[in-house]
């Protein structure tokens, strides 16, 4: 190896000045082409990463979570319809039909956009079991119309079992499949982005190093202190290195903001929203099916604990007040606590605190419903449960949903902005990079041609 290097060094020293200048020119052109390839390849990789996270995977996950929401809310409205005499709760009937149409459309859209093998069977399960559930609910409605309470309860229990044990788990599985795929893709794309930036920097340094070496050679061998063309080529290479590095780093940062800051909050907020829908359904089931009232009450409390658990001696008001000041409350856990402990964007804290406060109002009304039911005031409990007027349960739940939606909208806007900015960061490189590389190559040629002409003359 040492002998080979020695021979190569000896061969180089035997080269004439024109040969060295031509060699430097060709090496500079080669390094320019390498920079062109590294930059375009890196830009395309960065753009693919942003598209995969922002346009492909994330919407699929949100769609799966919205399927969960619609299923849970549809069933809650079915229970609300059954709590009163036929025709007395048109709001519940309307909401049920809207959710039915929505969930059918979303499952159909998911079937048209299958990306992973696991999705195929999950979507088939959703399609088949949803049809069975809707048929069963229609049977329940028929029994309800005839005033057959036993038929209503027996068949509704079967429908509820389909929702709880098949449909909701299938929707959750669809969400999980897409979420894991997104996590894998994100990790892979981040690594690829780091490699791309590394190659761009290395190829840039190689090109800049060659240009500097040529100028030093001219200064030493030919007593030419300054070569304006080579200086311009070097300046362009340095500026382009700074510009491209900034663009790659900014695109990587915006991808991180979209995935880790905004989208993970969106996922948690939507998961919490889905749990809240299911808890709201348990509240109605508690009144609808007295035989299993304790079971439905415990299911409600379990879901509430997933959403929010307050430390001993604290209330929703005290925790909300502390959270509004940015204080972390020890012992405060659940999805709402996680959101309040992960505030990133302007207005997010205020919206999250409002969500917590509104949920506290809803829970207070739920306690009143159970107190009325346990006091034998079944009709009053139902009226409070299905009522949409201020001070009634459905009104309070709607207030909670609106506050939750505002928090979601803030994170969604941040996600969309980060994705849009990520695309802007790497926009136009397919045009600017060839222009820059061509300019460097041409300036190098123009800078060396007079020196080469001196020897050819």
Residue ranges and their predicted role:
Residues 49-125, 151, 258-354, 385:
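Membrane-proximal N-terminal soluble sensing/regulatory segments of transmembrane proteins
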Residues 264-266, 270-271, 386-414:
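Extracellular/periplasmic juxtamembrane segments that couple receptor/chemosensory ectodomains to their
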Residues 2-22, 42, 194-251, 434-457:
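Juxtamembrane interface at the cytosolic side of transmembrane helices
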Residues 36-71, 193-197, 237-276, 425-429:
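Amphipathic alpha-helical segments and their boundaries
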Residues 182-201, 415-432:
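Membrane-interface helix-start motif
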